[in-house]
Amino acid sequence: VGVDNTRASIGMNIKPGQTVMTGEGAEAVYVIGPDAFLQREKTKITFEDSAGAQAMRIVTGSVLSVFGKGREKARKLQLTTPTATIGIRGTGCYIEAEEARTYFCLCYGEAEAVPTGDPKQKETIRTTHHEHPIYILATGGKMMAPATVINHTDAELTMLENVVGRWPPFHGQGGSRY
């Protein structure tokens, strides 16, 4: 696991403009402010901050993320993949970014998914427990297609929320489905 060209270490701060990379067989859990991330193997993510908006560019790979809400005012958070731009608010989500498509599961919260190939096909999504996973495609007539829940669990979401002192909204509502 590396941050820019430096081997990552426990307690290392990640700042806007930096890139976090994981190699084969590596995973990383890290916290930036009220947000926590589980970055899977072979993933490259850059964090940016411009004009008061925070951005996370998933260049390639997979990441499970939980985002806290702003205290004083609404936070502007934007996720970018090769095929989509996703605006998020108080959200837990899982992304697998590839060149031709992005898998996006809004585990809970609210997001606006905008396909890069046709921004007019944007969709606002609201979920409480994995109800609307989608693929966002790079090309084609219909840019978003239904998907199923893959490669992430409620236990992982709970762990990430606990790392930042919270519980996921589905906590205490019966058994886990994922």
Regions found by a protein language model. Name each.
Residues 1-178:
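Flexible, surface-exposed loop/linker segments and immediately adjacent secondary-structure boundaries
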